[in-house]
């Protein structure tokens, strides 16, 4: 297994970069990274992963996984896991409607993405929260298209006027019309994936053109603890068969859906990501994967995740190190805050975690524009 070397950190788009290669941050030693890796392999071998998808469960069984059909659990051997890691693509480029606008993964670039959409919106006039609207989405798409350092544009709003049953398809259409950059929208159902891929085929110029120049990656979120969801697997299958990359990122939550220690959370998070990698490579060997290291801690007062905690930043740095151990480009949840409005708290929490993630060498930083959880 080829460990990914720490690359020079650059800001901005190709041709306009700011080098920060002389500064780096880490929180784990090499032996600690290996300990987490070994613990994840034990989890997958002994506890296994629950797979809510009959076809995928059978596919894993055919590949040598031990299947507990009564409980829909697949137990994965070290060989199956590491062979899948070796097969996975680890560098790729997403292209915008204007192919000069690119988001490059695995090249050491600093990729920022505006949020694919939230249900609530902080009104700029009242500073109060309200339901997001279609006008908010249009404004956010225009803003993301105009901001030089945003590489991937999201709608930032889930407008209440658009029925949820086809909202992701509708917003995909608005994105490809409203920006010439790569874009992303949230997908929740396999049927929506069919329509979204058809939109991008039309923009790219057909099936072959989209394969040659990918324009969209899907995001699969394993459900902690240790589950792969049916809808997510339906979507992944359609995307990898269309030759598009996949980002795999569970939101394991310390003391909630993951162990009460950060190390335990990292081991579980890593196991869930590796299980997703195995599935992508069984479906389409060579599929490019981004390692979505996005664990959080639970605020025991509210029982929801904390976006602005110190632990959030520490685990983000650790996840970069673990992703580099396997050679994957890495996406982390930093640049977030627990503040409910854009204020000093928001600036401090966002800035601190974003800086640490950047200095650790992450590839992508998502959900720019979010306040609160």
Regions found by a protein language model. Name each.
Residues 1-135:
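Acidic/polar, glycine-rich intrinsically disordered N-terminal extensions of enzymes
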Residues 21-25, 302-307, 335-342, 369-373:
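Short beta-alpha connecting loops at secondary-structure transitions
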Residues 73-250, 254-259, 263:
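Catalytic alpha/beta active-site cores
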Residues 151, 250, 283-293, 329-334, ...:
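Glycine-rich phosphate/pyrophosphate-binding loops
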Residues 175-182, 267-278, 315, 355:
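Acidic, His- and aromatic-enriched active-site or binding-groove loops in soluble protein domains
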Residues 261-265, 301-311, 341-351:
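Short glycine/threonine-rich loop-to-helix capping motif typified by GTGT followed
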Residues 275-331:
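Phosphate/pyrophosphate-binding betaalpha-module
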Residues 340-373:
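C-terminal catalytic subdomain
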């Amino acid at each position: 297994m080829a460990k990914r070397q720490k690359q020079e950190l650059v800001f901005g788009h190709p041709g306009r970069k700011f080098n920060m290669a002389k500064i780096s941050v880490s929180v784990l030693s090499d032996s600690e990274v290996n300990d987490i890796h070994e613990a994840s392999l034990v989890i997958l071998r002994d506890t296994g992963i629950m797979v809510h998808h009959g076809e995928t469960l059978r596919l894993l069984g055919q590949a040598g996984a031990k299947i507990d059909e009564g409980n829909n659990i697949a137990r994965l051997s070290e060989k199956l896991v590491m062979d899948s890691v070796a097969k996975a693509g680890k560098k790729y480029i997403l292209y915008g409607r204007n192919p000069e606008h690119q988001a490059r993964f695995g090249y050491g670039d600093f990729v920022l993405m505006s949020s694919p959409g939230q249900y609530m919106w902080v009104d700029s006039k009242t500073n109060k929260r309200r339901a997001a609207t279609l006008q908010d989405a249009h404004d956010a798409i225009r803003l993301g298209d105009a901001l030089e350092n945003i590489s991937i544009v999201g709608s930032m709003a889930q407008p209440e006027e658009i029925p949820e049953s086809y909202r992701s398809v509708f917003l995909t259409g608005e994105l490809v019309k409203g920006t010439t950059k790569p874009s992303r929208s949230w997908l929740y159902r396999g049927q929506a994936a069919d329509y979204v891929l058809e939109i991008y085929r039309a923009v790219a110029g057909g099936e072959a053109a989209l394969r040659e120049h990918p324009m969209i990656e899907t995001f699969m979120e394993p459900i902690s603890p240790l589950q792969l969801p049916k809808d997510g697997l339906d979507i992944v299958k359609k995307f990898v068969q269309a030759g598009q990359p996949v980002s795999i990122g569970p939101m394991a939550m310390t003391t909630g859906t993951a162990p009460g220690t950060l190390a335990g959370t990292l081991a579980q998070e890593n196991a869930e990501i590796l299980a997703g990698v195995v599935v992508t490579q069984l479906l389409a060997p060579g599929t490019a994967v981004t390692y979505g290291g996005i664990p959080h801690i639970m605020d025991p007062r509210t029982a929801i995740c904390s976006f602005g905690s110190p632990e959030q930043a520490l685990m983000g740095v650790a996840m970069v190190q673990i992703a580099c151990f396997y050679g994957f480009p890495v996406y982390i949840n930093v640049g977030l805050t627990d503040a409910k409005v854009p204020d000093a708290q928001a600036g401090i929490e966002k800035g601190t975690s974003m800086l640490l993630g950047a200095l650790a060498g992450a590839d992508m930083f998502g959900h720019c524009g979010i306040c609160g959880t």
